């Protein structure tokens, strides 16, 4: 079906729908209600050159829930990268020890580069300001589980749309399903022109604004993102705009929408929102486990001809 997970643009609508159906089958295994040995004896290699909490831990959980194991690193300071070992050599080494590789890197294109070097499946867990396809799949899964559909949804993407790789991937995926989108950001953090051009060329309805009030009464999903401090070239400019959008209880309490966030949040969503029925971000984070379980099982067991084709 597919050999790697590098960019959401590599997937057709039917591919995404299939993955989401497989993810739903994984939910009782993800929660621990049922146990699986589908990837028993298999090893997932982890290459994390940037910090991660949810993505890394959910991949580890996903692999272990399927009966497999995990090796790798989350701190390059403890690897030979500090001695100057190249990305390609590190990937080749890890591919010899594992059945698939998950990589997060600060450089756009890093995941696709190593997919051309190694002979095991590669999953992009975020490449700079580029793509984050597995986050997009769990975002779509969250919408599908709540609304029962993705097509025809009205989604507002709010915050750092320039450097936020999650919104880059999500915008392309929503376009495949025919959802309409509103982009809410300061001018300096607007969605890149090439993405807007691609969406409009595909016939997608796109609205741009600096004001959340312009669109909040029109949307089903409020997808909020943090300002990417680590990618911001000017610390003073970051300090000036970091609080441009702040979602609190009064923002959403009486509105028929859900609030999503790829996390971590800084101060863009008040903790008082957490207890409201509109808050979906913690559930969204959990859905990373069944979605990534589905991907790992499809990539590893089907590619390697594993005898453990069944979930259990």
Swiss-Prot record:
Q: Which keywords does this chain's UniProt record carry?
A: Pyrimidine biosynthesis, Transferase
- An annotated GO cellular component: cytosol
Could you confirm whether the keyword Transferase appears in this record?
yes
Q: GO MF terms on file?
A: amino acid binding; aspartate carbamoyltransferase activity
| Binding site residues for L-aspartate | 83, 165, 226
Q: Which Gene3D superfamilies match?
A: Aspartate/ornithine carbamoyltransferase (3.40.50.1370)
Give the record's GO biological process terms.
Answer: 'de novo' pyrimidine nucleobase biosynthetic process; 'de novo' UMP biosynthetic process; amino acid metabolic process
> What is this enzyme's EC?
2.1.3.2
Q: In which pathway does it act?
A: Pyrimidine metabolism; UMP biosynthesis via de novo pathway; (S)-dihydroorotate from bicarbonate: step 2/3
User: Cross-referenced Pfam families, in alphabetical order?
Assistant: OTCace, OTCace_N
- The residues the entry assigns to the signal sequence are none
Which family does this protein fall into?
A: Belongs to the aspartate/ornithine carbamoyltransferase superfamily. ATCase family.
Q: What is this protein called?
A: Aspartate carbamoyltransferase catalytic subunit
Species: Methanothermobacter thermautotrophicus (strain ATCC 29096 / DSM 1053 / JCM 10044 / NBRC 100330 / Delta H) (Methanobacterium thermoautotrophicum)
Q: Could you read off the lineage of the organism from its UniProt record?
A: Archaea, Methanobacteriati, Methanobacteriota, Methanomada group, Methanobacteria
């Amino acid at each position: 079906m597919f050999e790697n997970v590098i960019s959401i643009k590599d997937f057709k609508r039917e591919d995404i729908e299939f993955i989401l159906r497989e993810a739903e089958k994984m939910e009782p295994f993800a929660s621990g209600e049922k146990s699986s040995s589908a990837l028993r004896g298999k090893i997932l290699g982890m290459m994390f050159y940037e910090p991660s909490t949810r993505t890394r831990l959910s991949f580890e959980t996903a692999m272990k829930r399927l009966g497999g194991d995990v090796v790798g690193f989350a701190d390059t300071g403890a690897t030979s990268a500090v001695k100057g070992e190249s990305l390609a050599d590190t990937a080749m080494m890890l591919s010899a020890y594992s059945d698939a590789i998950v990589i997060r890197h600060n450089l756009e294109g890093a995941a696709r580069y190593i997919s051309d070097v190694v002979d095991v499946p590669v999953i992009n867990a975020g490449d700079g300001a580029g793509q984050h396809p597995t986050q997009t799949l769990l975002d779509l899964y969250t919408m599908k589980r709540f609304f029962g559909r993705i097509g025809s949804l009205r989604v507002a993407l709010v915050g750092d749309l320039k450097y936020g790789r999650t919104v880059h991937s999500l915008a392309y995926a929503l376009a495949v399903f025919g959802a309409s989108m509103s982009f809410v950001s300061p001018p300096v953090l607007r969605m890149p022109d090439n993405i807007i051009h691609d969406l409009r060329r595909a016939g997608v309805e796109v609205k741009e604004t600096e004001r959340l009030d312009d669109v909040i009464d029109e949307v089903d999903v409020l997808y909020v993102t943090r300002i990417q401090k680590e990618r911001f070239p000017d610390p003073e400019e970051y300090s000036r705009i970091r609080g441009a959008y702040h979602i609190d209880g009064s923002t959403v309490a009486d509105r028929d929408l859900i609030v999503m966030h790829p996390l971590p949040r800084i101060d863009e969503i008040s903790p008082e929102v957490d207890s409201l029925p509109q808050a979906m971000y913690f559930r969204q984070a959990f859905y990373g486990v069944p979605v990534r379980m589905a991907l790992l099982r499809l990539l590893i067991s089907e590619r390697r001809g594993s005898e453990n084709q069944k979930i259990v």
